[in-house]
Amino acid sequence: REALELGLKLADEVKPNLLVATDPDADRMGSAIPHGGDYVLLSGNEMGVLLMDWLANMAKENGEDVASKVAVSTIVSSAMPDALARDWGFEMRRVLTGFKYIGDQIDQLKNAGEEDRFLMGFEESYGYLVGTHARDKDAIVATMLCVEMASYYAQKGMDLYEAMDALYKKYGYYLNGTVNASFPGESGAQKMAGIMSGLRENPPAEIGGFKVVGMTDYAACAEMPRVSGLQKEAAQELPAANVIEFRLEDDNK
């Protein structure tokens, strides 16, 4: 919210229907919606899901085959896009953190002559890419589409907060959180290595009251997670990374 303070101050004066802002190099986009007497800030995951669903709707209205589309996100982003992919029928791919990996997926589609299959890519850290003109986050295009999407829902009598709530009611409510832990210096690196080693050797049986039903260790070049869609290409392996994913019951992770 702090990053939007100047915009929110101006919004109090001009009373807009939507506040959109980018960072100085215009690769990340944040938004705020006036609702219930205050401004509601959408998370990066929520905006990614909203754009993904809206783009699928636009593709359908334009007579495109939505099931042929490919969307890309990261292994640390919300699991909610998987539910959208299953419902719409498009393919959802998960890559390591970093937009270069999303760009790699675009290159693969381009090399196969199938650029038009790319629906969008996003990270939970407010980075979005719609179109194949770039291989990095593009807040300029994302801002234009966000405004167009807001207009689309306004014609239906909804703001973006209400549109997101409608998706939650349809697909289920997803809560995403990040905890940052610092391990400075050589001793910190050793401690972190010990924690990761312990998790690999003795994985927890439950986390937060949810049973652990699966574990993926990305240090071993794990297979790229894919959901739904055509899945025309052979399975891909992700580059090795010191990341462990625990899958919990009820589609939590």
Locate each region found by the language model.
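Catalytic or ion-translocation cores adjacent to nucleophile or general acid/base/metal-coordination motifs
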Residues: 3, 43-56
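N-terminal small/polar loop signature for handling phosphorylated ligands or for N-terminal nucleophile
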Residues: 1-31
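Short Gly/Thr/Asp-enriched flexible loops that form oxyanion-binding sites at enzyme active sites
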Residues: 27-44, 81
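Short, hydrophobic/amphipathic alpha-helical packing segments
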Residues: 4-8, 49, 147
